[in-house]
Amino acid sequence: HDALPIFMITVPFENINVQNKIPISVDINDLYNKIVIQRRGGFCYELNHLFATYLEHKGFHVTRAAATVYTPNGGRSPEGSHMSLYVNIEGTLYITDVGFGDLPTSIIEIGSKTQFIPTYDKNGVYRAVWINDNQYALQKLRQNKWMTLYEAHLKSQSIKDFEDKISYNEHHPHSIFVRHLLITQPQSFGRATMTYHSLTLSNDSTKHKYDVTTNNYKYFLKKYFNLNVSIIPFEP
């Protein structure tokens, strides 16, 4: 239970290597070097594969699950392109995803078909519900309505099963990770999120935005994400 919040408040979600056109590797030794030694972050495949491998070494039964993300404007990601994680502890399933940009810093129990167990966090209220016997949905309460963040299949996947999705999100011009910079991490006050244009500091009730420039982006990277890295499009 302690490993997940520690990981999330230490390791940012970020796609800087995609923006810098540095190849993505999900080899576990490369991930350890990047995230633990170099103190970087990554996106879902990197963060969740490393965290799943850690949990497996601790004796947990972890499943890498293919999920489809719902975007706030009503769109959807390519089918199964997000890698979610869940663990089975004595017959109860818990989402242990550390590689999604909007998650609480605690595990989320997937309750029974009739009982939903909300998870309360500085950034909002979350729950996991069954869609059918083979799928679950992660949801967040927004303006008194439960909104689906993603739907995932229970079927176990290997990291190799995501190779085409990783390639899409690393190279395809339609991929959000190719088109945009996204760095986000839980904070003591809520969450910090940075793009090429703005830094947003938010929690469930407030939001403050600041302009990001070539002059201040490294300061923000260090202050909020503990990152010391150049982002090529910011550089002259």
Predicted regions and their residues:
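Short coil/turn segments at secondary-structure boundaries
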Residues: 14-19, 232-236
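Short, conserved helix/loop micro-motifs enriched in His/Cys and acidic residues
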Residues: 19-39
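Short clusters of hydrophobic/aromatic residues that line enzyme substrate/ligand-binding pockets
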Residues: 13, 35, 110
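Acidic/His-leaning functional-site neighborhoods
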Residues: 131-227
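Hydrophobic/aromatic-rich core segments of domains that either
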Residues: 49, 53-121, 125
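Glycine-rich, acidic and aromatic/proline-enriched surface loops and short helix-turn segments
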Residues: 9
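Short, small-residue-biased leader/transition segments that mark boundaries at the very start
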Residues: 1-4
